[in-house]
């Protein structure tokens, strides 16, 4: 009991009963808060980025949920409080994840990877379905859904970082170095793709970048990319062949391309390629409303809470939240968001270069790559540079499990940063033996 009290006191600054906790409750709370801030270590710039994006999220989610509140007979304040609670939960995730020594994630990487495989299979057959794609499963106890691909991504990048760090001596060998790395990537991507092709492509792209940085044989990487591009090229060819330019609509697809989400993928490609500035219709409605929002924002925006497009733009609080940011805060506000994500990437690359251990360096780089690529994919869709992917803007879009997994990823990055900080200043930071 005495040891437990000692641990609590060292970790959170909670005084023991013997020291008069009932008589010094106010000082105890102040000490707890001060100790928590003091124990928040790692890259301070990344912590600041989390705070900035969270504040932006609160403002824009509150502004963009008016139509959603009307649809479900709720108030916009209810969504504001929900997002605030989610942000607080996310910060807690970040705090505890960054307090854990990052080597722990290497030890659990294989277990999490093996767990994610049956979860993805279960989700595909029995998961909650949206737009013909099963992406979520419902947790029975708390009655909440979460996207299993988020767990699979995190587990894969942990395992991939572990494999890259352990196989540097044989990394150029096809059998000993390449196959143990590429097989887990293929397994996860193949299981994610039927329900969420954009996420599978994001995972694959991040993995290939990490493999290149990890000194995997370039010929092996290019060969794999060439093979992976074959189904993408086939989809593009089918989208072009089975589109009637005269009538401006898709033709009947062959049976082989009419199952699952394949028609949705083809339709999005056709919409992206063939819809022009003056096209009006159900398929172009969302992107047209996003364009209207962006155009009306100008350089400086209409001001916080003054969006008009939020009442017409579907998913303005998630997939198309960047369009609302551009409308309310203008191109300067949008440029600031881009700068924040680039700053985050820069800090993580800097962390990669400073980290003395391969696993931590690869892990920080992988998690930062996937978050930044996702952010730019979302922003690209909003400005009609990419076809609609359905990915959200990390730390900004209203979300649930995806937001928490993003926070967990950032917490792991900060865990690596914390270790680097300790390596650089061993005298300034004392590592407690009873640390998590």
Predicted features by range, described:
Residues 349-390, 396:
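Loop-to-helix entry and N-terminal half of a specific, functionally important transmembrane alpha helix
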Residues 85-93, 328-345:
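Hydrophobic alpha-helical transmembrane segments
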Residues 130, 134-136, 225-331, 359:
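Hydrophobic, glycine- and aromatic-enriched re-entrant/interface helices and adjoining loop segments
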Residues 2-48, 52-53, 59-195, 379-392, ...:
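Membrane-helix boundary/helix-loop-helix interface segments in multi-pass membrane proteins
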Residues 207-220, 307-333, 391-404:
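Interfacial segments of multi-pass membrane proteins
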Residues 176, 180, 224, 362-370:
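Alpha-helical transmembrane segments of multi-pass membrane proteins, especially transporters
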Residues 110-111, 117, 177-190, 197-257:
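Hydrophobic alpha-helical segments of polytopic membrane proteins
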Residues 92, 100, 159, 264, ...:
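Transmembrane alpha-helix boundary/anchor motif
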